[in-house]
Swiss-Prot record:
Protein name: Ribosome-binding factor A
Any one of the GO BP annotations: maturation of SSU-rRNA
Species of origin: Petrotoga mobilis (strain DSM 10674 / SJ95)
Biological function: One of several proteins that assist in the late maturation steps of the functional core of the 30S ribosomal subunit. Associates with free 30S ribosomal subunits (but not with 30S subunits that are part of 70S ribosomes or polysomes). Required for efficient processing of 16S rRNA. May interact with the 5'-terminal helix region of 16S rRNA.
Record-level Gene Ontology MF annotations: ribosomal small subunit binding
Gene name of the encoded protein: rbfA
Main location: cytoplasm
Pfam families: RBFA
Quaternary context: Monomer. Binds 30S ribosomal subunits, but not 50S ribosomal subunits or 70S ribosomes.
Keyword tRNA-binding assigned: no
Cell membrane is among the record's keywords: no
Gene Ontology CC terms: cytosol
Native organism taxonomy: Bacteria, Thermotogati, Thermotogota, Thermotogae, Petrotogales
HAMAP family in UniProt: RbfA
Protein keywords: Cytoplasm, Ribosome biogenesis
Cited InterPro entries: KH_dom-like_a/b, RbfA, RbfA_dom_sf, Ribosome-bd_factorA_CS
Length: 117
């Protein structure tokens, strides 16, 4: 039952954070495509880890901007979800997409080498 509740909370928090992106006033985020790939709430519900990716090259800048605005996201969660303790929001760069691209390139390279034999 606890796992189901945590998954429901993660889903709802992901929606709220996505809505929060439109409330950010930072001009550096204008016209940036930001995608939330995964949201993980810690077992004690004190941390919410948000894994973000972007098609833009400056993902590290985007992560820094989001981490600087994490208080706004925490307030948004507190206003919309009733919880005893509102989790601290932490944004991370999602390495999964980059890793899959590297793996695909390696596979293509191996296939080309095998065809050349």
């Amino acid at each position: 039952m606890a796992q189901y509740r945590r998954e429901m909370l993660e889903s709802e928090m992901k929606k709220l954070i996505t809505q929060g992106f439109s409330q950010l006033k930072d001009p550096r985020l204008k016209d940036k495509f930001i995608d939330i790939n995964m949201v993980r709430l810690s077992k004690d519900k004190s941390y919410l880890d948000v894994y973000v990716s972007s098609l833009d090259e400056d993902i590290d800048t985007i992560i820094n901007i989001l981490n600087n605005a994490k208080g706004m996201f925490r307030t948004l969660i507190a206003k919309n979800i009733k919880m005893f303790k509102v989790p601290e929001v932490r944004f991370h760069k999602d390495e999964g997409i980059e890793a899959s691209i590297r793996i695909n390139k390696l596979i293509e390279k191996i296939e080309k080498n095998e065809e050349g034999k």
